[in-house]
From Swiss-Prot:
This is ENHANCER OF AG-4 protein 2. InterPro entries: CID_dom, ENTH_VHS, PWWP_dom. Residues 184-354, 384-428, 575-613, 723-766, 957-986, 1014-1356, 1369-1392 are annotated as: Disordered. GO terms for biological process: anthocyanin accumulation in tissues in response to UV light; cell differentiation; maintenance of floral organ identity; mRNA processing; negative regulation of flower development; regulation of timing of transition from vegetative to reproductive phase. PROSITE patterns: CID (PS51391), PWWP (PS50812). The gene is HUA2. Residues 1059-1129 have a biased composition (Pro residues). In cv. Sy-0, a naturally occurring allele K525E, termed ART1, together with active FRI and FLC alleles causes delayed flowering of primary and axillary meristems, resulting in the distinctive Sy-0 morphology. The keyword Phosphoprotein does not apply.
């Protein structure tokens, strides 16, 4: 027999088989590939060229001979490309040519589709195949229909026509059945049904075209209604295709073994065969329904619909229908009639050996008879209708036999229920082929309409329930079944929108079916009643259709009708195992639709199926029986699982199991697993309680699994399922609910959709499963490589926001929680919590999905997040601090309710001793990093961490991200913590560039960029807040909470004075670990003890001491340089502190290196340095504590000290240039500490180490680089230099000091202000050095009292007062002075 026209024909033509009239793109030199059509040269008076094609170009109407290599067939793909090209500039006439060829192409396509609709179905199965298949398939179908005489309404409508057409139409129809690989063989198995079909279905009136139309299901359903009549015809058909019939018999026998046994005689004689098969079926179905009843004959599931479709696609004419979806699944199966047979066999194997055999028989019979009826459109139409009718009529048994072969569970169910009538899905599959093509394809799924996407998934779940049958046919069967179900009501529409219509039809059918089911459903046991084995199976994998089938089987055992309907749906979907679930669902829907048109008895059966369909479409929420409900739960669980795995991916896999669907399914599966893990928690909160209660009502051990599935993809369908289950739970025979009007069902579907859209985890997964899976996987992968850098956290935040767009916000949060809980490293926990902070703050600032999803989700998960990120115990103290900072930031920004946050803050503080005031225990941020983190080794630079307020600080740059909280932390342990937290919080906001005052009680300072020098203004007038209040740079957001925290800790550390230095004032925060004793040489070897002290005193008005010892002390000290070290130690110490703050070399009076050294010399111990700085006050206190008492008290406050220290650590803190020497954490902490920490500073300070006598320390003149470096007024510098030059030249440290000076101006200005104009001179000098203010900045942070500008405001007069301290130019000198612990830099003096 000549092969039918193949789908691949157009492609073949493109390769060189172009014929007259074919549209092509011809390439002519100098022009783009031009639209043309193959023409006849004779028409243009040209001699044909055998080696070239004669083409006529569109647009220009020119002609040419073109070589084959330059010609390519015009396809849809080429069309799209051309249209895209036309969007831009094109060659003249090109757009016109494209338009013309597109018009011609569309016309050809329409013509082809019409021809294919009529002829292709015939051709696709090939005449022989069609005939044989028709004979066998018809017989089988008839048998099934007969068995399902109760479903007469199904069989009768189509079968009368089939009868008329008899052999020919049957053959054609069988051909289609064969092509669709529907359950024709299964139908064969049910000979009695086949007879019925034969009698009523072979009406010569029915044309192939009609059948094609009938494929929609309406005509077929009608014919199927007369199933028994068709059986008679079926006999004829069998006779016609003797060989096929025999094969059919063989197949029938196999089917028998599969629970849909129909003796070979069945094939031979429709009635007797039907009876035989009925007997066999009855036996297999546990004889629960007599074979004579033909009601629910356990007819063999004909899982060949999918295979037949494949055959069709192979043949090519049916291919147009199967074209897109069936194409993928079918083509691989077989390419020739023989191949088709094989394919059928293969599919049959999927559904069962029986189906395969049946298909074989059908194929052979079709092959034998196909020649005559290959193009018999009427026969084809009839066959399709017959198939549809058979499918509907035998849908219950169909599923049963499918179960048998495909899965023992369904098989058992079929056995338990005589309703196992062999569905004649073959016709359906053919009908639905087109829809299936669309439906099978992912694209089809989407085009089908929203219903298609979601209901399709739900039917898939249903398919999963009856998964055995749906294997072979699921993909095509889905659409086909949908068509069939619609076919009962509106098969044509179903074809167009198989899934959607299928759902709708199922909904419509369901009411009647539900009513009928109400009778039968009560018999069915709910899953909770089902044997634990069945339930267990179901529980094991709701997705697994076999398990669902088992449940169905059990139910069917109790309610054969319900079971058979369920089985039928399963049988319809007898295609691939992967696509089984989806296909089953579709099949169920189709069956339900067909059952709708079936008689009342059949309706009961179909009602079960319809219920399942409804349940499937509604996520198995509407199952009528408790058994149905159980199945529906299984389906819903499976569906949810499938949906979650791949909302539509599962469906897609069913559609294109051989294509990308598998990949999508894999992604969806992984996603589903994750969802299962976290959705169990989220679903219970998100899904309707009804669903949970339903699960509970069901008594399902797998209800949690279903719930999880529901959370993932059941949110759309599960809520419905929940409702349906709830109803069902109320009464196992919840038929009333299930028999709700189709409108109600549709309403439920709408609800489903709403739920899916509302339930983001579900809706997103279903609508954009692939994109969502990709986003989620990307986010999960980002978590594995997450670091604390702003870039890393920002990237992860963007991925999380993308996930929220797909409804995965709860999943992302759950993933973060699990990651936090499983993370063993505390520093990694902090990284993850910072990510939570970033996501939360970003969402809080956003409108839309992200903002609406993450904030409430994080709020609900806060207890778990905090419990995992900040666990109790000493080891997690840093985590608690950082979490506190984040919480405080949230509190400040009102991300969450204040009451909630305060409760958590209190809990965290109570959880650990250091939670509130453990800053002293804080480690440098780098030490908190992973051991293998290269950033840990980057000493001297601030890491670009999330929440870090400092970037890399290099000597020449100002650190604009100095931590404000450093001072805050210094002020109060708890306050410090809070401040650091606030600062950290601010920093944590990646977008937050503004400087935020961490604590309202602290003075708020505003940093101003003055000549690249940040000045801090004391807004609140509280010097404490100066540093903490504001960040030097907009990079505050950059500053990580970690960094801020370390700063706070450092502040705390800063509090403790060096052992040698006088204790900080009580008001200062608890001292951090004692800094290395900064020898408080109370002006150790100050050559002129009076000189050094006065200059320090003059030069270093105690900035911190302003409270206790305001400018007066500093002013007086400058006037009295003679005072010996003790007085100077007080004043000088203050001066030194000031000097150190200013980093003005007060060499003359002291070996300024000493204190500066102490500050800088103890870089290792930032606290010491701070102490030195504060110690400037404190040190002065040490040596001249009594005189400095007030100053120390004032300066004792860490901030003052910090400020002064800042002068010395300006490089580290304030100035970017010097910060490099300091660790980033130090910068964060305080300028002082940073300077001290700064290795360079420390090394340089080492010269001036307090331990080293000032005399021992190298003397460097302040006037040198420091002053010039800071560009202090020459007079001041000269004064300082003069005053201190002869006493002490500044040692080389001054370079460090210079760096510090660069920063120092920063600090000094702040210190100066804070220092109450004591640092006026110093500030003036600093002011002259805008670049230096960094240091000063660092300082003004520490001394909130001093306005940053104050330092700069200090007049040279102050400097003159400090003339003894001419070292101002060499702020390094002050740093050096700080080297003398006895001389508090800040405490020494304050300009009047």
């Amino acid at each position: 027999m000549a092969p039918g026209r193949k789908r691949g024909a157009s492609k073949a033509k493109a390769k060189g088989q172009l014929v007259l009239g074919d549209l092509v793109l011809a390439k002519v030199k100098g022009f783009p590939a031009w639209p043309a059509k193959i023409s006849r040269p004779e028409d243009w008076d040209r001699a044909p060229d055998p080696k070239k094609y004669f083409v006529q170009f569109f647009g220009t109407e020119e002609i040419a001979f073109v070589a084959p290599p330059d010609i390519q067939a015009f396809t849809s793909e080429a069309k799209s490309k051309l249209l895209a090209r036309c969007q831009g500039k094109t060659v003249k006439y090109f757009a016109q040519a494209v338009e013309q060829i597109c018009t011609a192409f569309e016309g050809l396509q329409n013509h082809k589709s019409n021809a294919l609709g009529d002829e292709d179905s015939l051709d696709a199965t090939e005449p022989g195949l069609t005939k044989a298949e028709i004979v066998d398939g018809t017989d089988h179908i008839v048998i099934e229909s007969e068995r399902t005489d109760n479903f007469n309404f199904r069989v009768d409508p189509c079968f009368p026509k089939l009868d008329e057409n008899n052999g020919e139409e049957r053959k054609a129809e069988i051909r289609k059945l064969d092509s669709s690989s529907f359950l024709e063989s299964k139908v064969k198995t049910t000979s009695p049904v086949s007879e019925s079909l034969e009698h009523s279905s072979f009406d010569p009136k029915i044309k192939k075209e009609d059948f094609d139309k009938g494929t929609d299901g309406s005509a077929c359903n009608e014919h199927f209604g007369n199933g028994q009549k068709k059986l008679a015809n079926g006999k004829r058909i069998k006779k016609e295709a003797g060989g096929s019939d025999r094969k059919g018999e063989d197949t029938v026998h196999r089917d028998k073994s599969n629970n849909s046994h129909v003796p070979g005689g069945r094939t031979a004689s429709g009635n007797s065969d039907s009876k035989k098969s009925k007997g066999l079926l009855t036996e297999k179905t546990s004889s629960k329904v007599s074979a004579d009843k033909h009601e629910n004959s356990p007819g063999i599931k004909v899982g060949v619909s999918g295979k037949k479709r494949r055959l069709e696609s192979e043949q090519g004419k049916l291919a147009p229908r199967v074209d897109e979806s069936s194409r993928a699944a079918k083509k691989p199966r077989c390419e020739s009639a023989d191949n088709k047979v094989k394919c059928e066999i293969d599919d049959g194997s999927d559904s069962t050996g029986t189906v395969s055999d049946i298909k074989r028989e059908i194929v052979l019979g079709l092959g034998a008879r196909g020649g005559n009826f290959q193009y018999d459109k009427e026969a084809v139409a009839y066959t399709k209708r017959q198939r549809q009718t058979m499918e509907h009529a035998t849908s219950p048994s169909f599923s049963g036999s499918r179960d048998k072969s495909g899965k023992g569970h369904l098989e058992q169910k079929d056995r338990s229920s005589p309703v196992r009538n062999v569905k004649a899905p073959a016709a359906q599959s053919l009908k639905k082929r087109r829809a299936v093509c669309i439906y099978d394809e992912d694209d089809d799924e989407d085009p089908k309409t929203p219903l298609h996407g979601k209901p399709a998934i739900v039917p898939q779940a249903a398919s999963v329930l009856t998964d055995g049958p749906k294997r072979a046919n699921v993909c095509h069967s889905t659409s086909t079944k949908a068509k069939i179900s619609a076919g009962s009501t509106e098969s044509t529409e179903v074809r167009k929108f198989p899934l959607r219509k299928h759902c709708e039809d199922a909904s419509r059918v369901l009411p009647s079916n539900a009513e009928n089911s109400t009778n039968s459903l009560p018999v069915v046991k709910p899953i909770n009643e089902l044997p634990p084995k069945d339930v267990k199976q179901i529980l094991q994998s709701p997705k697994m259709s076999p398990q669902l089938v088992l449940t169905n089987k059990h139910v069917a055992g109790q309610h054969k009708v319900v079971k058979s309907s369920v089985k039928v749906s399963g049988v319809v979907m007898a295609k691939k195992p992967q696509s089984d679930s989806c296909k089953e669902a579709v099949a169920g829907s189709d069956k339900i639709s067909s059952s709708q048109s079936q008689p009342a008895n059949q309706r009961h059966k179909s009602a079960s199926v319809g219920e399942r369909l409804t349940v499937v479409s509604k996520a198995a929420s509407r199952l009528n029986d408790s058994g149905s409900r159980d199945m529906s739960e299984d389906l819903s669980a499976a569906m949810l699982d499938l949906n979650r795995e791949k909302g539509s991916a599962t469906f897609t896999s069913a559609k294109t199991p051989d294509s990308a669907a598998s990949m999508k399914d894999l992604i969806a599966a992984a996603q589903a697993k994750r969802k299962l893990a976290h959705t169990q928690n989220s679903i219970f909160g998100n899904l309707n309680p009804s669903f949970l209660s339903i699960s509970d009502t069901q008594g399902r051990s797998h209800s949690p699994f279903m719930v999880q599935n529901a959370s993932a993809s059941a949110a759309i369908s599960m809520p419905l399922v929940v409702q349906g289950h709830h109803q069902q739970g109320s009464s196992p025979s919840n038929h009333g609910h299930q028999s709700l009007s189709r409108n109600q069902i549709e309403t439920d579907d709408n609800e489903e959709r709403r739920l899916s859209s509302g339930h983001k985890s579900v809706g997103g997964s279903l609508s954009c499963s692939t994109e969502a899976a990709i986003s989620r996987d990307a986010f999960e992968g980002m978590l594995e490589t997450l670091s604390r850098t702003r870039e890393s956290i920002g990237r992860a935040t963007r991925l999380a926001i993308d996930c929220a767009k797909y409804g995965l916000a709860s999943e992302v949060v759950e993933l973060l929680i699990r990651k936090l809980e499983s993370e063993s490293h505390f520093h990694r926990k902090v990284d993850l919590f910072f990510l939570v902070d970033s996501i939360t703050q970003h969402s809080h600032s956003q409108k839309g999905i992200a903002g609406a999803s993450y904030v409430p989700t994080v709020q609900a998960a806060l207890p778990r997040l905090l419990g995992a990120a900040a666990p109790p115990g000493t080891g997690a103290s840093d985590n608690r601090r950082k979490c506190l900072k984040v919480l405080k930031l949230w509190l400040e920004r009102k991300v969450f309710p204040e009451s909630l946050l305060r409760r958590y803050i209190d809990d965290i503080r109570a959880s650990g001793d250091d939670a509130t005031g453990g800053f002293s225990l804080r480690r440098p941020s780098r030490s908190e990093r992973a051991v293998d983190d290269p950033i840990r080794e980057m000493e001297g630079m601030l890491v670009d961490e999330y929440g870090s307020n400092a970037t890399f600080q290099l000597p020449g740059f100002f650190s604009s991200h100095n931590f404000e909280d450093d001072e805050e932390d210094d002020d109060l342990p708890t306050s410090q913590k809070e401040k650091s937290t606030s600062a950290g919080e601010r920093v944590s906001a990646l977008d937050d560039l503004e400087i935020h005052d961490t604590s309202s009680d602290k003075c708020h300072r505003v940093l101003e960029d003055v000549d690249h020098e940040l000045e801090m203004e004391d807004v609140s007038g509280q010097r404490k807040d100066v540093a903490p209040s504001s960040f030097c740079e907009n990079k505050t957001k950059e500053q990580s909470l970690d960094v801020m925290e370390p700063v706070a800790e450092k502040s705390t550390e800063f509090n403790p004075l060096p052992e040698d230095s006088p204790p900080l004032p009580q008001e200062s925060p608890p001292p951090l670990p004692p800094l290395p004793p900064s020898p408080p040489p109370p002006s150790p070897p100050l050559p002129p003890s009076s000189l050094p002290p006065p200059p320090p005193a003059a030069l270093f008005p105690p900035l911190p001491p302003p409270p206790s010892q305001p400018p007066p002390p500093p002013l007086s000290p400058p006037p009295s340089p003679p005072p010996p070290p003790p007085p100077p130690s007080q004043s000088l110490t203050t001066q030194l502190s000031i000097a150190s703050h200013h980093q003005i070399p007060f060499q003359p009076g002291f070996p300024p290196p000493t204190y500066p050294l102490s500050h800088q010399t103890y870089p290792g111990s930032m606290q010491q340095d701070r102490s030195s700085i504060f110690t400037g006050d404190q040190i002065v206190q040490g040596p001249g504590n009594s005189s400095r008492g007030g100053l120390v008290e004032g300066a004792g406050k860490p901030e003052y000290f910090v400020q002064q220290s800042s002068s010395f650590s300006p490089a580290g803190v304030c100035s970017s240039r010097e910060p490099s020497s300091f660790t980033s954490s130090r910068q964060l902490e305080f300028g002082n500490s940073d300077v001290l920490f700064n290795p360079e500073a420390s090394s340089q300070n080492h010269r001036f180490q307090p331990s080293t006598p000032l005399s021992q320390r190298p003397m460097v003149r302040l006037p040198s680089a420091p002053s010039s470096h800071f560009s202090y007024p020459s007079h001041i510098q000269s004064q300082s230099q003069h005053s201190y030059t002869h006493p002490y030249p500044f040692p080389p440290q001054r370079d460090d000091a210079r760096r510090y000076r660069n920063e120092e101006p920063w600090r000094i200005p702040s210190s100066g202000h804070s220092a109450e104009n004591q640092n006026g001179a110093w500030i003036h000098g600093r002011n002259s050095h805008p670049g230096l203010p960094r240091v000063t900045d660092s300082f003004f942070r520490p001394p909130p009292e001093r306005p940053p500008s104050g330092t700069m405001n200090y007049q040279p007069s102050a400097a003159s007062n400090l003339q003894a301290v001419p070292a101002i130019p060499g702020h390094t000198a002050p740093q050096m002075l700080p080297s003398r612990p006895d001389i508090p830099t800040v405490n020494c003096w304050r300009p009047a």
